[in-house]
Structure formats: structure tokens, C-alpha cells
Amino acid sequence: MKSNLKWTAVVSILLAALLHLPLAYAQVRTTSGAVSKSSGIQHPKELERRILQLTNEARRKNGLASLYPDNDLAAKARTKSDDMLMNKYFSHTSPDGKTLKDRFKEEKPAAFQTISRIGENIYMGARFDYFTDIKTQARMIVDGWMTSPGHRRNILDSNFTHLGVGVSAKDKMCYATQIFSQVK
């Protein structure tokens, strides 16, 4: 009986510790996102929506307007998350040296002219399907960004008006990217 109680206590402590790691351990439900047939990468739309919702809640709590969802920015955010996942890196600068501004200028130079400001938040975490639900995973991601000064600054930047969120998951990894913009 004592050994069962000790085992339960150890497991509870380990689970609580994992929940509070800087890179949140989280889940992506395969039923809530599209799967790329060629790569097996999942794009869980419900998680993306929840991250957007929680980001806007954080802004409203700080007296700021909500950000408008932007499908073009979301596509760029998914591409960034896919790139980090497939090329196994975690950085705002890709292995080929490209930054967010470089990617914008290359992909849609005309569209880039309508944007006066852009910003990017990125996340990488292990994925445990049995560990949390979508709401908890989104909360862990956004809370992590809110405790990081640079990421918090992006979320609470009053100049930003639009946001795209892109999440990519495969095997045991999950990457999320937020791209913020201010339209001229």
C-alpha cells in the first residue's frame, strides 16, 4: 500500500514538473487538423484558432484591440512551422539565413509594400497526445509567449492589427508560429 502511494506521488510530481517546463509539452489531435499526404505533417486548425483566441484575450486584458485573423499570414506561419519541423531547427532565422522580412520580400513583394511592420513568435514543444487537450496546449503556448519579454512585446504591440497562426506537428514534435502585421 505504501509503495503504491509513493508511486502515485512520484508520478504526480513528474507530471506537474513537465507541465511547467519552458517548452510546453502538448498534444495535437489528429482529428482537428489537415494532414499533408506527402510529409505526414499535421496542421491542427482548432489549435491555431485557440491560440488566436487566447492571444486576443491577452490583448483585451491589457486594453488593446483584438487582432484580425489573416489567412495569408496564417499560410506563411504554417510554412515557417513546417520548415522548422522538417529541417529540425528552432530559430527566427532559417538555416539558409532568411528572416521573416526576407521571406515576405521574396514570396510577395507587392504585398510586402502594404505592410509597415511585421513580427514573429515561434514555439517548439514535445507532443504527448495523452497529456493535455487542445485548450490546455494552446494555453501553455500562449502563456509561454507571455512570460518571454520579446514574445510578450509582439502580442501586446498596439501597432499590430493582423495575426496569422500556423501549427505543424509530426511524430512527437509540435511547432507553432505567429506572424503579426500592421497594414499601411
Language-model features: locations:
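A short, structure-level motif marking secondary-structure boundaries and short turns
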Residues: 39-42, 65, 136-137
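A well-ordered secondary-structure block
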Residues: 100-182
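Bacterial N-terminal signal peptides
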Residues: 11-20
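Short, well-ordered surface patches within globular domains
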Residues: 43-110, 152, 158-164
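Short, contiguous pre-domain boundary segments
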Residues: 31-41
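Bacterial N-terminal signal peptides that target proteins for export
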Residues: 1-10
